[in-house]
């Protein structure tokens, strides 16, 4: 029975998780959520044992950075 008192601190230490991961999640632009992430967010990491770091599946700026050439948009201006 004495060993139970010695194992309890190790068990609590195991459940605590790594310190600072919630801060790292926020730095990456995410937020912590208990359980799984809901649409339109995806899991980008872990905040703790049962807590996911959720973020957007895509960024709007990444979609806006795609450039299209004007000759692709204008009919009859194909150089080939």
Swiss-Prot record:
Has bactericidal activity. Strongly expressed in the tongue, bone marrow, bursa of Fabricius and trachea. Also expressed in skin, esophagus and air sacs. Weak expression in the large intestine, kidney and ovary. Expressed in the vagina and ovarian stroma, but not in the ovarian follicle. GO terms for cellular component: extracellular space. It comes from Gallus gallus (Chicken). This is Gallinacin-3. PANTHER family: BETA-DEFENSIN (PTHR20515), GALLINACIN-1-RELATED (PTHR20515:SF20). The keyword Disulfide bond applies. It is found in: Secreted; Cytoplasmic granule. Keywords: Antibiotic, Antimicrobial, Defensin, Disulfide bond, Secreted, Signal. Residues 1-20 form the signal peptide. Its main location: secreted. Residues 21-22 form a propeptide. Induction: Expression in cultured vaginal cells is increased by LPS and S.enteritidis. Belongs to the beta-defensin family. Disulfide bonds join 25-53, 32-47, 37-54. It holds the Pfam family Defensin_beta. GO terms for molecular function: CCR6 chemokine receptor binding; chemoattractant activity. GO terms for biological process: cell chemotaxis; defense response to bacterium. InterPro entries: Defensin_beta-like.
